[in-house]
A protein has these predicted regions:
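Short, low-complexity disordered leader/linker segments with a strong preference
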Residues: 1-35, 55, 357, 412, ...
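Short, well-ordered beta-strand elements
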Residues: 30-41, 60-65, 87-88, 187, ...
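Short, polar/charged alpha-helical segment
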Residues: 41-61, 386, 404
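Extracytoplasmic "Venus flytrap"/periplasmic binding protein-like
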Residues: 51-123, 132, 157-159, 163-166, ...
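Hinge/lid segment of periplasmic solute-binding proteins
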Residues: 93-146, 172, 200, 205-206, ...
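C-terminal lobe and pocket-closing loops
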Residues: 113, 268-283, 293-388, 422-433, ...
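Extracytoplasmic/periplasmic solute-binding protein
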Residues: 133-142, 147, 172-218, 261
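Glycine-centered hinge/linker elements that transmit conformational signals in sensory
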Residues: 175-177, 214-245, 291
């Protein structure tokens, strides 16, 4: 086991007692307890559904622990090092590769093969793929998110357009027209430069991968990312987007409704926020649309969370029953009606609350084209490097050619350990085993 994991284990042993106490539940004789860690609002909502699961399965009790998102990653690593992980856990899709590389996740394909509930073909392809690491299924999607366009229908019509953009060229044309209409103190699009999701969404629409050489080096100097950066930076160069971070914007919902910007890229959670905060006179005057792509509606981020069973769980069968329960289309539909999270299964979208919602329809369309990000444990550090460098282009005037070179250098440093490990594995594969060496020597002697 790598030395850093040994150090992590030693550092975390002091937390073991705390985790053990927090995770223990008083269990009646003959009852199995499944420890389930969930995050934020989802943890609160799922507790309402757990009672139904326990009624269906009287021999199983579920101990739900609510982990704040801000502390979740550190707590999971601490628990891994201290052998204190739960049975079932909600994992962000970008965290799945990390815990898979730690060999902490149970392979789920055997469970899926005999399941009458979890049907891989019913899941959006890009979302399902986020849970397949090195060809092995290690999670089941729970809810999904992706980023697309929220837009003001009335202002777009005033600028002369009766439909949202479908291609990058159409988007450029519409933003230019909107800016001419808006004047100097209002804008076509709001793209907070302290975020990375916009750049990442656009980059996933390109054919070039973001990493190369078996995910050991950055590929940001590729033609695809250069096109992405040029398109993104041009929004600011033309004055279509303000050079502002989210902290400089008092309230994104208020600004949207007062016409500060016409387009805004965000996720499904904002459907409820915009509905709640919309002025009465603007009801029906805003909508959602799939992200434009280079040649038509484009790809987007395969975000959301998945349900996993940790490898050291002693309650794998009961844990799988819980995952199956939460994966039922009717349960997912109820989960959506309570919290607004979007379901990962196509069949769930037939529920009236989703099928009859025109604001959700664009997300349904976009989910057919989502793509997973590179499946490396360093990914969250890599996207922060991307954010830093693209902000330097927008704010500091860093030349785009220099920016992609700098970004590749930064990412190569982040991936240095992965590159070394990959090289060691390659060398080991080339070294003949003692038996094969003896056979070669014997053959030569003859």
């Amino acid at each position: 086991m790598p030395n850093w994991i040994d150090r992590l284990r030693r550092w975390a042993l002091s937390a073991l007692a705390v985790l053990a106490v927090a995770g223990c539940a008083r269990t009646e004789p003959g009852t199995t307890t499944v420890r389930f860690w969930a995050m934020g609002r989802e943890a609160e909502v799922v507790s309402e559904l757990i009672h139904e699961f326990e009624a269906e399965n009287p021999g199983i009790k579920v101990d739900v622990q609510n982990i704040p998102w801000t502390a979740a990653h550190e707590k999971l690593l601490t628990a891994f090092a201290a052998d204190g992980l739960p049975d079932v856990c909600q994992l962000g899709n970008t965290w799945v590769p990390e815990f898979a590389e730690l060999d902490a996740l149970t392979p789920l394909q055997p469970f899926v093969q005999r399941s009458t509930v979890v049907d891989p073909k019913d899941y959006f392809r890009g979302i399902w793929d986020t849970n397949v690491i090195h060809g092995e299924l290690v999670g089941v999607p729970w809810y999904v998110d992706t980023r697309l366009i929220y837009y003001r229908k009335d202002l777009l019509a005033k600028a002369g357009y009766d439909h949202p953009p479908r291609t990058w060229q159409e988007w450029d044309e519409q933003m230019a027209a909107i800016k001419r209409m808006q004047g100097p103190n209002r804008y076509a699009v709001l793209m907070p430069i302290n975020e990375f999701e916009q750049q990442l969404s656009l980059a996933l629409q390109q054919p070039d991968p973001l990493l190369r050489d078996d995910d050991t080096r950055g590929n940001f100097a590729s033609p695809g990312f250069r096109r992405t950066l040029a398109f993104y930076a041009n929004m600011f160069e033309q004055g279509w987007a303000p050079k502002m971070s989210e902290t400089q914007i008092s309230n994104v919902w208020d600004e949207f409704f007062r016409g500060f910007n016409v387009f805004y890229i965000s996720g499904p959670w904002n459907i409820r926020e915009f509905k709640k905060l919309q002025p009465k006179e603007l009801e029906g005057q805003w909508g959602t649309a799939a992200l434009p792509g280079p040649d038509g509606p484009g790809a987007g981020i395969a975000g959301g969370t998945s349900l996993v069973i940790f490898r050291k769980s002693q309650q794998k069968e009961a844990s799988w029953k819980l995952i199956e329960f939460l994966s039922r289309p009717e349960i997912q539909a109820r989960f959506h009606s309570i919290i607004g999270d979007l379901p990962p299964r196509r069949s769930t979208w037939n529920a009236p609350s989703l099928a009859n919602d025109p604001l959700a329809a664009a997300f349904r369309d976009q989910l057919e084209r989502v793509k997973p990000t590179p499946k490396v444990l360093e990914w969250e550090r890599i996207v922060q490097e991307m954010r830093i460098v693209t902000e330097k282009v927008v704010r500091g005037g860093l030349a785009q050619d220099k920016a992609v070179e700098e970004l590749d250098q930064r990412v190569d440093k982040v991936l240095a350990k992965r590159r070394w490990m990959h090289e060691q594995q390659r060398l080991q594969q080339r070294v003949p085993s003692p038996q094969s060496s003896s056979a070669v020597a014997a053959g030569s002697a003859q």
